[in-house]
Amino acid sequence: MDMRVDRSGQVKILVFNIAGEEVVQLLNKNESQGNYRVDWDGKNTNGETVGNGVYFVLIQQLSGLTTRRVIVLK
């Protein structure tokens, strides 16, 4: 998934399931302003493949929050 960091600083990317439970943290570090690509391999924090369904990717950065919907189908 493509994303833009508007201002250099802390960027955190989390994936949640439809129940609002955190599935995995994809990123938590300082990034410079610019365009980035982040990939999710469809696995949870324990390395297990998640089930089919709708997931939400939360991108938190200094300029605010963005949420994206991801559908996993096997």
Where are the regions a protein language model picked out?
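Glycine-centered coil/turn sites that cap beta-strands in beta-rich domains
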Residues: 1-15, 25, 40, 61
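Beta-strand-rich interaction surfaces with strong enrichment in secreted/lumenal proteins
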Residues: 26-30
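Generic structural signal for well-ordered beta-strand positions
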Residues: 23-24, 50
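C-terminal tail/sorting-segment detector
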Residues: 39, 45-74
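Short strand-edge motifs at loop-to-beta-strand transitions and within beta-strands
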Residues: 34-38
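Short, glycine-anchored, charge-dense loop/turn motifs used at functional sites
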Residues: 16-23, 55
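Surface-exposed loops/turns
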Residues: 7-8, 32-33, 46, 51-52
